[in-house]
From Swiss-Prot:
SMART domains: Adenylsucc_synt (SM00788). This is Adenylosuccinate synthetase. Mg(2+) binds at D13, G40. Its main location: cytoplasm. It comes from Francisella philomiragia subsp. philomiragia (strain ATCC 25017 / CCUG 19701 / FSC 153 / O#319-036). SUPFAM superfamilies: P-loop containing nucleoside triphosphate hydrolases (SSF52540). The lineage of its organism: Bacteria, Pseudomonadati, Pseudomonadota, Gammaproteobacteria, Thiotrichales. The gene is purA. It is found in: Cytoplasm.
Length: 428
């Protein structure tokens, strides 16, 4: 058995879904442990794209069970829509293969409205997706949240909804001056959805614990990336959950169980959606080339992603934050045939050269130390034997700086276009 964690090692959008989908073929359980439908995973199978936001990437494998852990915030409307959309394409989703923690915090219309009006009312944009993620986590922490299991009990749901609305009502009326659904409207909407989704509600704590205890293969699928972590990320331009490996322990069930692999998913370059510092960002034709060739448009937001060179000081920082055991490098093909190729090995900051970022660093004030790398061209199928020497040098540069190995290499959109250097399911 293996317990494998997939963590985004950058600002999200690294290709976690593709790696999770590939590993799901040998997995008994794939578990989402944090975030919500602000995540966006694109899977390409036989040339067909499948977009996922809440449901784990194991859904394309009939033998694999999918779990949404208690650390996830769930929008019932989004969940119902995603289930229906996938079922309409012939993907099997039932109470036999999808399990939603009864303890998940629910996203309401009030959370989404509050998210939107806050973002639109400030001059300092965070770049929120507007999905209500942050406000839902706020209610969770302040003990005003609605749990998934509350959707099925009329009295409890109405009581919890009234508690959640009490403060927001004042904000909507007096501060933001916006219309909002009445308590009864929202109650009816949520209760109706709850009856439809009740079949998926489960004690996921026990499901995961049982799987691990009996030697099953479990993959924990993260959303976003370490650099968006509420504690480790580029605050305040972060999400509202622990996107690092810490989120596995708080948002799923691994207490008393060892993690065999913590894989940091990393693009061969760097991207970021929304606001925030980006030391290696490219503003020239090369950046535009990478954006177009890489199809760098957010699945969830539709926003164009900012692009830049691979940032090793930030990658090393992510590796330390999540105790990564290896790197899965994705989208290497996007860098193929570039005339110029660079990589950031360090920063000049406050009169010093540093080679690993840290929480207190002001990334707006760093000057990236860029080194030229030899460009390379890739064949349609990449093997260890035909891999260009320039690419091998690029990989060694990453490994030497980060201090951990690259365990897989993705060089195209389909699940077949991955070269594995390590068997994650082999012990020892």
């Amino acid at each position: 058995m293996s317990n494998i964690v997939i963590v985004g090692a950058q600002w999200g959008d690294e290709g976690k879904g593709k790696i999770a989908d590939t590993l799901a073929e040998k997995s008994d359980l794939v578990v989402r442990y944090q975030g919500g439908n602000n995540a966006g995973h694109t899977l390409v199978v036989n040339g067909k794209k499948t977009f996922l936001h809440l449901i784990p990437s194991g859904v394309l494998h009939k033998h694999t069970k999918c779990v949404i852990g208690h650390g996830v915030v769930v929008d019932p409307i989004a969940l119902d829509t995603e289930i229906t959309r996938l079922q309409d394409t012939g993907i099997e989703i039932s109470a036999n293969n999808l399990f939603v923690s009864e303890s998940c915090t629910v996203i309401t219309s009030y959370h989404k409205l509050l998210d939107a009006v806050r973002e639109n009312s400030t001059t300092e944009k965070i770049g929120t997706t507007g999905k209500g993620i942050g406000p839902a986590y706020e209610d969770k922490v302040s003990r005003k949240g609605i749990k998934f299991k509350h959707l099925f009990d009329k009295d409890v749901l109405r009581s919890r909804l009234a508690l959640s609305l009490a403060e927001k009502e004042t904000l909507f009326k007096d501060l933001y001056k916006v219309e909002y659904p009445s308590l009864e409207e929202e109650f009816e909407r949520l209760y109706t959805l709850g009856q439809k989704l009740k079949q998926y509600s489960a004690d996921t704590f026990s499901i995961i614990d049982q799987a691990v205890s009996t030697g099953k293969n479990v993959v924990y699928e993260g959303a976003q990336g370490v650099l968006l972590d509420i504690d480790y990320g580029t605050y305040p331009f972060v999400t509202s959950s622990n996107t690092s490996v810490a989120g596995v322990y708080s948002g799923a069930t691994t207490a008393g169980h060892n993690l065999d692999h913590v894989i940091g998913i990393t693009k061969a370059y760097t991207t970021r959606v929304g606001e925030g510092p980006f030391p290696t960002e490219l503003f020239d034709d090369t950046g535009l080339f990478i954006q177009k060739k890489g199809g760098e448009i957010g699945v969830t937001t539709g926003r164009i992603r900012r692009c830049g060179w691979l940032d090793l000081p930030l990658l090393k920082y992510s590796a330390k934050c999540s105790n990564l055991t290896s790197i899965a490098l994705t989208k290497v093909d996007v860098l193929s045939d570039l005339d110029t190729l660079k990589i950031c090995i360090g920063y000049k900051y406050e009169g010093k050269e540093i080679f690993c970022a840290y929480p207190g660093i002001d990334l707006y004030k760093v000057e990236p130390i860029l080194v030229d790398m030899e460009p390379f061209s890739l064949d349609e199928v990449v093997t260890k034997e035909n891999m260009p020497s320039a690419l091998k040098t690029y990989l060694r540069t990453i490994e030497n700086h980060i201090g951990i190995p690259i365990s897989s290499l993705a060089y195209g959109p389909s699940r077949e276009q991955i070269l594995f250097f390590e068997d994650y399911f082999k012990k020892g």
